[in-house]
Amino acid sequence: MQRRCLSEAKKKYLAKMTEMDPEGKEIRSIKIAKELDVTRPSVHAMLTRLSDDGLLVKEHYGIVYLTPEGLATGKKIIASYNHNS
């Protein structure tokens, strides 16, 4: 798949979601909002963008999960954050 440049906001969401669920199972959007201390509408908008990028799948009732590409990208972001600290 084509390599894309991710905004810092997208990186923050992917890293947090990967930390919350390193297995790539399911995460509730309300939990993401609480973890990042942002509003639910903000989470919804970002999850839509990440879904459009093919990095996660949105299901009913606020359930999302990272695609294999999303999970791999999240792990790379976390590794780069750890390397830079």
Positions of predicted regions on the chain:
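Basic, amphipathic "hinge/linker" alpha-helix immediately C-terminal to the N-terminal HTH DNA-binding motif
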Residues: 62-78
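Amphipathic alpha-helical dimerization/coiled-coil segments
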Residues: 82-85
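A short, conserved structural fragment
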Residues: 51-59
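Short alpha-helical segments that sit at the start of domains
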Residues: 1-15, 79
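Key DNA-contact positions within bacterial/archaeal DNA-binding proteins
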Residues: 41-44
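Short, hydrophobic-biased segments on the C-terminal half of alpha helices
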Residues: 47-48
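Short acidic, hydrophobic short linear motifs in intrinsically disordered regions
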Residues: 23-33
